[in-house]
């Protein structure tokens, strides 16, 4: 199984949880040091993991990753950039990087890995979006749009490949206590947590539990769905 963007935050917690449940995990990221540290953390708990360095902003790197990962039965499209810029302040360069990493990379990585899933007659894909895909986000509209694209991929891929035994779902987290989220959103991050029905932010492991469930046999009749793990933020 393959988890992209797994050297920190939600991706890292997801990889660790899969390993605790007995999976052999391939993790990706740009930082080789953090990759090695994540592998070591998994192995010290008795798990199995391999790190593949990949820059998902580079389509050639995406294709190399697919080749190196080999036969993948579970794919977690988690890697993302995180920027907070309102419309009048959004620059073209960071916009392009965001859509390359958040939209183009998961599309073509999934396309490269699907043939072996189809041949095997089974597979599970979980895309990680955001509650921002479902609500207006005035301080980060481009980020919200990129996440909405992932949710659209989920529905289209579920429709296209369900007959091949492949399930595709999305987890849409709410405000989650990762270093990148706290650094990017600052005071607004805590305010978002306070606005959820549960009145708090999430811990990465809480999001990871939902991801692992959707990839597991326990979710065998679940496909094409977006599961909001956002403390009820989008419920009202």
Question: Where are the predicted features?
Answer:
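Conserved glycine-rich cofactor-binding loop
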Residues: 7-9, 31
């Amino acid at each position: 199984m393959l988890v992209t963007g797994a050297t920190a935050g939600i991706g890292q917690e997801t990889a660790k949880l899969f390993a605790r449940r007995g999976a052999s995990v391939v993790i990706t990221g740009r930082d080789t040091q953090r990759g090695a540290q994540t592998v070591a953390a998994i192995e010290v708990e008795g798990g199995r993991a391999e790190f593949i360095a990949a820059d998902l902003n580079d389509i050639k790197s995406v294709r190399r990753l697919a080749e190196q990962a080999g036969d993948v039965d579970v794919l977690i499209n988690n890697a993302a950039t995180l920027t907070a810029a309102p419309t009048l302040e959004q620059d073209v360069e960071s916009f392009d990087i965001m859509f390359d990493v958040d939209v183009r990379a998961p599309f073509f990585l999934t396309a490269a890995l699907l043939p072996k899933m189809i041949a095997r007659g089974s597979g599970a894909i979980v895309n990680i979006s955001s509650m921002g895909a479902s609500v207006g986000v005035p301080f980060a509209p481009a980020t919200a749009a990129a996440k909405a694209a992932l949710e659209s991929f989920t529905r289209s891929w579920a429709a296209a490949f369900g007959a091949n035994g492949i399930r595709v779902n999305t987890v849409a987290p709410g405000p989650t206590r990762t270093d990148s989220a706290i650094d990017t959103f600052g005071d607004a991050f805590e305010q978002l947590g306070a606005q959820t029905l549960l009145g708090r932010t999430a811990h990465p492991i809480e999001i990871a539990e939902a991801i692992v469930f959707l990839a597991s046999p326990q979710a065998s009749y679940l496909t094409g769905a977006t599961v909001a793990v956002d403390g009820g933020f989008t419920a009202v």
